[in-house]
UniProtKB/Swiss-Prot annotation:
<comment type="subunit">
    <text>Efficient DNA binding requires dimerization with another bHLH protein.</text>
</comment>
<dbReference type="InterPro" id="IPR036638">
    <property type="entry name" value="HLH_DNA-bd_sf"/>
</dbReference>
<feature type="compositionally biased region" description="Basic and acidic residues">
    <location>
        <begin position="508"/>
        <end position="519"/>
    </location>
</feature>
<feature type="domain" description="bHLH">
    <location>
        <begin position="412"/>
        <end position="461"/>
    </location>
</feature>
<dbReference type="Pfam" id="PF00010">
    <property type="entry name" value="HLH"/>
</dbReference>
<keyword id="KW-0238">DNA-binding</keyword>
<keyword id="KW-0804">Transcription</keyword>
<dbReference type="GO" id="GO:0046983">
    <property type="term" value="F:protein dimerization activity"/>
</dbReference>
<dbReference type="Pfam" id="PF14215">
    <property type="entry name" value="bHLH-MYC_N"/>
</dbReference>
<dbReference type="GO" id="GO:0005634">
    <property type="term" value="C:nucleus"/>
</dbReference>
<feature type="region of interest" description="Disordered">
    <location>
        <begin position="402"/>
        <end position="422"/>
    </location>
</feature>
<feature type="region of interest" description="Disordered">
    <location>
        <begin position="468"/>
        <end position="524"/>
    </location>
</feature>
<dbReference type="GO" id="GO:0003677">
    <property type="term" value="F:DNA binding"/>
</dbReference>
<dbReference type="InterPro" id="IPR054502">
    <property type="entry name" value="bHLH-TF_ACT-like_plant"/>
</dbReference>
<dbReference type="InterPro" id="IPR025610">
    <property type="entry name" value="MYC/MYB_N"/>
</dbReference>
<dbReference type="GO" id="GO:0009889">
    <property type="term" value="P:regulation of biosynthetic process"/>
</dbReference>
<protein>
    <recommendedName>
        <fullName>Anthocyanin regulatory Lc protein</fullName>
    </recommendedName>
</protein>
Amino acid sequence: MALSASRVQQAEELLQRPAERQLMRSQLAAAARSINWSYALFWSISDTQPGVLTWTDGFYNGEVKTRKISNSVELTSDQLVMQRSDQLRELYEALLSGEGDRRAAPARPAGSLSPEDLGDTEWYYVVSMTYAFRPGQGLPGRSFASDEHVWLCNAHLAGSKAFPRALLAKSASIQSILCIPVMGGVLELGTTDTVPEAPDLVSRATAAFWEPQCPSSSPSGRANETGEAAADDGTFAFEELDHNNGMDDIEAMTAAGGHGQEEELRLREAEALSDDASLEHITKEIEEFYSLCDEMDLQALPLPLEDGWTVDASNFEVPCSSPQPAPPPVDRATANVAADASRAPVYGSRATSFMAWTRSSQQSSCSDDAAPAAVVPAIEEPQRLLKKVVAGGGAWESCGGATGAAQEMSGTGTKNHVMSERKRREKLNEMFLVLKSLLPSIHRVNKASILAETIAYLKELQRRVQELESSREPASRPSETTTRLITRPSRGNNESVRKEVCAGSKRKSPELGRDDVERPPVLTMDAGTSNVTVTVSDKDVLLEVQCRWEELLMTRVFDAIKSLHLDVLSVQASAPDGFMGLKIRAQFAGSGAVVPWMISEALRKAIGKR
């Protein structure tokens, strides 16, 4: 489509003047704040891609998730708002430099924003910077081609063909969008509220662009000092906009003639160039930005555009419908040339087209005319980067390519190592707790103390086992095989039967006249000896006591067993020749277990009492 020569030239002049860019930022801020909308973007013709509308500048006026202040100086509300827009612009440039150059991103100030500091609306604002439109594509392209404003309500419900950022708008809760052609480009305004179309809002939003912004000679020196201080500070004071006064000034400028306008423009340029420090700083920033853009692989958009938003496989591919040719440009170009010829040097009021922008009307309009061609991002690499950051792909930490993949793999390996180490430590702690529960007493609960107490306790147990074995040797030897005489009458004669009995074993005694009768173990112990054996298996406990018979001995033994919280299951007892043999099967009553040596000590105390 042939573009208006005057509008393209006006946009190029705007991009080439740093002072005009600073003025543009203040105008965008005034436009967004005058109607209290969330953001303002300015789209103009790109130098690297002729005939394509790209992002030029913007102002953010929406919600802030995380605010970072680089210095300790207290800022006003206006300065904080302007600082947020600058921080978002710096973050966008940092993302470009980190992915486009394939180099490590330079060190950034402490007050700079990171991707995790942005909210949904701020992400929508930053990602919108990566888009580009041909005339007739999307909302900015339609407004630029028709030279009329376009109002979109319920933006989150619009189709991706007419509004490619519909998905982003839905996540950011953007409801209403307004695009107005101004100063050779397109002004885009957006808000999270549903605002019906109103002509007065359009007039208020564009009033800052029609009002003369050049500084005039002040009758008092104090006014000049204030203006110079404001210029040095780099901030803008947002005043109440008066559209009627602005239109009066425009009419006065038009009546003054072309010569007066040219003279005033020269004065404005001379005064803007007077501040050398500010000019050099702004020029340096712009040159750095364009040098980054030149280093990146910027490919021209293909001329035969398709109907639908096409992104390659790594960027959320959306299938396209059948391609349709773009509308013939002859009539539109002729109309634009005729409109430029009849237009005044300063833009005045424009004819509006109040068309209800809904889903049904969009489909009907697309059925009449050829659907607008899909928008293709001007810079694919930055947009892919931003989408990876939105999806949590970790692109901010990596510089792209194999380096990013290696860093991601190393990060995953480190995370797995940390998790395995944490599980190992938890298992060790559990084992130390079990070991601590087996000790009878412990003074400290740290790992070194538990190990030391365990070693000492094992040595003590080993010593006691040796003592028990040494004390049982003289009593067990004569009792292993004992000869007893059992006398019974047999056919009138007394017959002596010699029987060998193993100590501690069970036997049947048909000699006593009762078959299959189980007898308690036969004990043979020396006088004055006693023996206690404790066997623990899970919750089952086997107690064997051998000692001299005394009165109340059984009572003391069972009192000791009761004090140890043992439930008695079975008892076998015998008391031949003044010695008592006791075999008790018991079970732990509660969940806790008693150490065997504690049971042995309690039984020894019970049988040792007099």
